[in-house]
């Protein structure tokens, strides 16, 4: 049985979602064959899969099968840093580059030099950082924050996402050119519910692992427990399976895990399907407008305009650039309208001339 596990030291795994991966199911075996074909190359790889499907484990396996196996493997969760810190974390910074930068520090690209950099949750990167990442991938060099000196790097980039980047591109949240740069090779990791042949081998691995930790003797799965595991949909994938097995070992009493020992969640995650063809969105808007018309409010246009802007601003996590792109407006117009509706506070140090200029900007038109 082909089994992948994370390194023993948790400090070596900075983006833990699943701690083990097997390739017993036919779908997993096909993935493994594809993985073994592309791993020796230097091509960028985009790994797509739900949370808990083992994306980091697959990335590590690619690294171990490549010519960079003796170099560093650095895993970075792009969603773990604020927008103000992610640039310094990825590309490094010089002393005094920002408040608190008391010394120069290499970024993750420099740390991974000669090896592999795994960027998990790549879809969470802010657009300005996506531009800089694209340049790094094209030029093979980084410029630290607060510096003008470029530093050559030799890094293979593997990226992963649990969202559909094509939809993010259409929504203006992800750059199309960066997508094609990262997506030289695509590896699709199927959720656990779609590869039932992996469930019992994984369960037995976790039983052995936790039995050793707990000081237990051999533990078996009853036939009914096995059937229950295979029939469950596993919305949390491998990570959920590991937690269920851990709990079952704490409650089973005779060296056999029974069906009643398996505490399965009642959580049902609604997965977004493709919208059917038609005018569903337009119909919803028409119904909403009809209700507003019935109220016969004299300032309806302004209410709708302000509500649209506020909603878009919050949807974009209060990012002006993303909001402007989503609405198809310039940043100046967006900023001026956000100030007008009280979503932004004007900097008191701005001069009178800038205030006059802002007031001349054309109002948002829906």
UniProtKB/Swiss-Prot annotation:
UniProt-listed Pfam families: Sigma54_activat
Domain Sigma-54 factor interaction: 21-250
Keyword Transferase: no
Effect of loss of the gene: Cells lacking this gene are still able to convert dimethyl sulfide (DMS) to dimethyl sulfone (DMSO2) under sulfate limitation, suggesting that the conversion of dimethyl sulfone (DMSO2) to methanesulfonate (MSA) is interrupted in this mutant.
Induction: Under sulfate limitation conditions, it is transcriptionally activated by the LysR-type transcriptional regulator, CysB.
Coiled-coil features, chain-numbered ranges: none
Keywords of the record: Activator, ATP-binding, DNA-binding, Nucleotide-binding, Transcription, Transcription regulation
Binding positions for ATP per the UniProt entry: 49-56, 112-121
Signal peptide: none
GO molecular function: ATP binding; ATP hydrolysis activity; DNA binding
UniProt keyword ATP-binding present: yes
SMART domains named among the record's database cross-references: AAA
Domain of life of the organism encoding this protein: Bacteria
GO biological process, one term: regulation of DNA-templated transcription
Role: Involved in the dimethyl sulfide degradation pathway. Activates the expression of sfnG and sfnF.
Entry protein name: Sigma54-dependent transcriptional activator SfnR
UniProt organism field: Pseudomonas putida (Arthrobacter siderocapsulatus)
């Amino acid at each position: 049985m082909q089994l992948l596990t994370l390194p023993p030291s948790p400090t070596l795994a900075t983006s833990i979602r699943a701690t083990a991966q097997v390739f017993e199911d036919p779908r997993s075996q096909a993935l493994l064959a594809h993985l073994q074909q592309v791993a020796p190359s230097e091509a960028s790889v985009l790994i797509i899969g739900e949370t808990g499907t083992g994306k980091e484990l697959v990335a590590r396996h690619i690294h171990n099968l490549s010519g960079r196996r003796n170099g560093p493997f650095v895993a970075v969760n792009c969603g773990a840093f604020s927008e103000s810190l992610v640039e310094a974390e990825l590309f490094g910074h010089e002393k005094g580059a920002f408040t608190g930068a008391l010394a120069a520090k290499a970024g993750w690209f420099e740390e991974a030099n000669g090896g592999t950099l795994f960027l998990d949750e790549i879809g969470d990167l802010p657009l300005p950082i996506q531009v800089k990442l694209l340049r790094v991938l094209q030029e093979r060099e980084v410029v630290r924050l607060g510096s003008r000196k470029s530093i050559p790097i030799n890094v293979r980039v593997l990226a992963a996402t649990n969202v559909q980047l094509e939809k993010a591109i259409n929504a203006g949240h992800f750059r199309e050119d960066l997508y094609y740069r990262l997506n030289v090779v695509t590896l699709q990791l199927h959720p656990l519910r779609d590869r039932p042949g992996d469930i019992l081998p994984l369960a037995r691995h976790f039983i052995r692992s936790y039995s050793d930790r707990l000081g237990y003797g051999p533990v078996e799965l009853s036939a009914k427990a096995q059937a229950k595991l295979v029939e469950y949909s596993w919305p949390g994938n491998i990570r959920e399976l590991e937690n269920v097995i851990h709990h079952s070992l704490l409650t089973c009493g005779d060296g056999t895990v029974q069906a009643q020992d398996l505490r399965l969640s009642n959580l049902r995650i609604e997965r977004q399907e493709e919208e059917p063809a038609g005018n569903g969105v337009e119909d919803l808007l028409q119904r909403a407008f009809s209700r507003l018309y019935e109220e016969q409010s004299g300032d309806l246009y302004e209410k709708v305009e302000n509500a649209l802007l506020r909603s878009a601003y919050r949807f974009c996590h209060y990012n002006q650039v993303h909001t402007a792109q989503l609405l198809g407006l310039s940043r100046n117009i967006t900023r001026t309208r956000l100030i007008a509706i009280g979503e932004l506070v004007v900097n008191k140090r701005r001069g009178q001339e800038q205030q006059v200029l802002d007031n001349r900007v054309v109002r948002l038109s829906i």
